[in-house]
A protein has these predicted regions:
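Active-site glycine-centered loops adjacent to acidic/histidine catalytic or metal-binding residues
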Residues: 3, 32-33, 61, 157, ...
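Short extracytoplasmic
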Residues: 1-15
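Conserved small/polar residues in nucleotide/adenosyl-binding loops
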Residues: 196-203
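Core catalytic region of metal-dependent phosphoesterases/phosphodiesterases
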Residues: 12-117
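A mature extracytoplasmic/lumenal domain signature
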Residues: 2, 62, 127-129
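Short active-site segment of divalent metal-dependent hydrolases/proteases
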Residues: 6, 35-36, 64, 160, ...
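His/acidic metal-ligating clusters that form di-metal
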Residues: 23, 100-107, 112-193
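Active-site-adjacent loop/helix micro-motif of nuclease/hydrolase catalytic cores
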Residues: 8-12, 39-40, 136-139
Length: 203
């Protein structure tokens, strides 16, 4: 699950979150950007109460740390990322969110690696903190995959190539990310526009 960007008043979204537990997931992988305001934290945790009783892992996105501000989505096509706000942005209660998740038994993968058993299978996971705000330190978890694991999983919020390429090079079997909401810019019939198709790869 990713990019809920929850506000307490969003009843339709909250109902959707509450219904997710009925899917009976073996594992919840949360890739961040959970909420948009401090008063949304408790509603978020209430709505996720069923999921929080299941095995889970998480990394944070920018909107777990900071209140979101509108940015031009086309800036991704021009600069490879949206421009950062020039004015101070209020913080969100991210440590309270972290504490709630870890108290429920979820594994914090922000620049960390963890192993757990799910449905009789050994899973080894590594993750990064939010690359969109340069909080990522992949070097802290980099290295070869766990040869004894049934599945090696990479988790990050913003799918920046420096992280995706590193995880693939290190032998991750699958990588989960969020942030783009299906594409920052989507065109009729063709779908998401990727800046990697429009710009040369950075070297």
């Amino acid at each position: 699950m990713s990019d809920l960007h929850l506000l307490a008043r969003q009843e339709t979204k909250r109902r959707f979150i509450r219904q997710l537990d009925a899917l009976n997931p073996d594992l919840v992988i949360n890739t961040g950007d959970n909420f948009c305001s401090a008063d949304s934290l408790q509603p978020l945790l209430d709505d996720m109460s069923g999921l929080l009783q299941r095995p889970g892992t998480f990394v944070f996105g920018s909107n777990d740390y900071l209140v979101p501000k509108f940015k031009n989505p086309f800036s991704y096509l021009l600069w490879g990322r949206s421009q950062q706000a020039t004015e101070p942005v209020p913080e969100l209660p991210h440590e309270e969110l972290r504490q709630a998740f870890t108290s429920a038994g979820w594994l914090d993968l922000n620049d960390k690696s963890e192993t757990l058993e799910v449905a009789g299978h050994r899973l080894t996971l590594r993750g990064t903190d939010d690359a969109h705000h340069d909080r990522d330190h992949y070097e802290e978890v980099a290295g070869p995959p766990d040869g004894e694991a049934d599945l090696n999983i990479g988790v990050t919020h913003a799918p920046y190539l420096k992280i995706l390429d590193a995880m693939v090079s290190d032998g991750m079997d699958i990588v989960f990310a969020g942030h783009t909401h299906g594409g920052q810019v989507c065109l009729p019939f063709t779908g998401a526009v990727s800046y990697t198709h429009l710009r040369a790869h950075e070297t």
